[in-house]
Amino acid sequence: MSLIDIQNLTIKNTSEKSLIKGIDLKIFSQQINALIGESGAGKSLIAKALLEYLPFDLSCTYDSYQFDGENVSRLSQYYGHTIGYISQNYAESFNDHTKLGKQLTAIYRKHYKGSKEEALSKVDKALSWVNLQSKDILNKYSFQLSGGQLERVYIASVLMLEPKLIIADEPVASLDALNGNQVMDLLQHIVLEHGQTLFIITHNLSHVLKYCQYIYVLKEGQIIERGNINHFKYEHLHPYTERLIKYRTQLKRDYYD
């Protein structure tokens, strides 16, 4: 069953050039779904279109758009508590003049009624999920953390709301290999144990082949291949997909040589 089903999604710029060319996309419920492709293929545009985050100079059309079996009219009603978004611009999510503890509890209480103590408990739990301790984070300002720490705080701010769907645009790109794998392990655990759904945009094919159940391959604004993980492991693939995987293998070989 699909949680999101969008048909004939097209994105154009002001010159009427199609950047995304009439794609059909389903995000399957309680699975880790992935969208892969080279830089500039349009992966982030698709994520922003699903969330209605596109810049004003781009237009988006589709034949139908359903979320959890219902036609979508105003997606903003789902933000936070039902749909979480992990973007690449994590540094812009927190201001520099308010301590992170206050900002995180405010985010939680914006979406859920509850006491400050309850919010702090949720914040503490989410920080532990991303291998951070509250005592090291809550009384600090964002500029006092490293980029990797701040990204993990940002991921925690999304996870603590326990959304039904998480759309993640390169969620571990700024993390080292150890913390990146820990975050992916956590996201996998959330999907498997808590029934949540993940749509991840990434160029990390190692993560895709290890964690994902359904995969889309995007090239120049078009989906040129799709299928479950067994298709990508065992079936004959599109030449473009073959090149992506071959390049990944070469990178790993160069790294270990």
Curated annotation (Swiss-Prot):
Domain of life of the native organism: Bacteria
Domain ABC transporter: 4-245
Subcellular localization, as worded in the UniProt entry: Cell membrane
Chain residues that bind ATP: 37-44
Predominant location: membrane
Alphabetical list of Gene3D superfamilies matching this protein: P-loop containing nucleotide triphosphate hydrolases
UniProt key word Flavoprotein: no
UniProt-listed Enzyme Commission number(s): 7.2.2.11
Gene knockout outcome: Deletion of the nikBCDE operon strongly reduces nickel transport and urease activity. Mutant shows decreased virulence in a mouse model of ascending UTI.
Induction of its expression: Transcription is stable during the exponential phase and increases only in standard conditions in late exponential phase.
UniProt GO molecular function: ABC-type nickel transporter activity; ATP binding; ATP hydrolysis activity; transmembrane transporter activity
InterPro entries in the record: AAA+_ATPase (IPR003593), ABC_Ni/Peptide_Import (IPR050388), ABC_transporter-like_ATP-bd (IPR003439), P-loop_NTPase (IPR027417)
Gene Ontology annotations for the cellular component aspect, listed alphabetically: plasma membrane
Gene Ontology terms describing biological process: transmembrane transport
Catalytic activity: Ni(2+)(out) + ATP + H2O = Ni(2+)(in) + ADP + phosphate + H(+)
Keyword Ribosomal protein: no
Keywords attached to this entry: ATP-binding, Cell membrane, Ion transport, Membrane, Nickel, Nickel transport, Nucleotide-binding, Translocase, Transport
Membrane topology of the entry: Peripheral membrane protein
Similarity field: Belongs to the ABC transporter superfamily.
Subunit text: The complex is composed of two ATP-binding proteins (NikD and NikE), two transmembrane proteins (NikB and NikC) and a solute-binding protein (NikA).
Function: Part of the ABC transporter complex NikABCDE (Opp2) involved in nickel import. Probably responsible for energy coupling to the transport system. Required for full urease activity and plays a significant role in the virulence of S.aureus during urinary tract infection (UTI).
Protein name: Nickel import system ATP-binding protein NikD
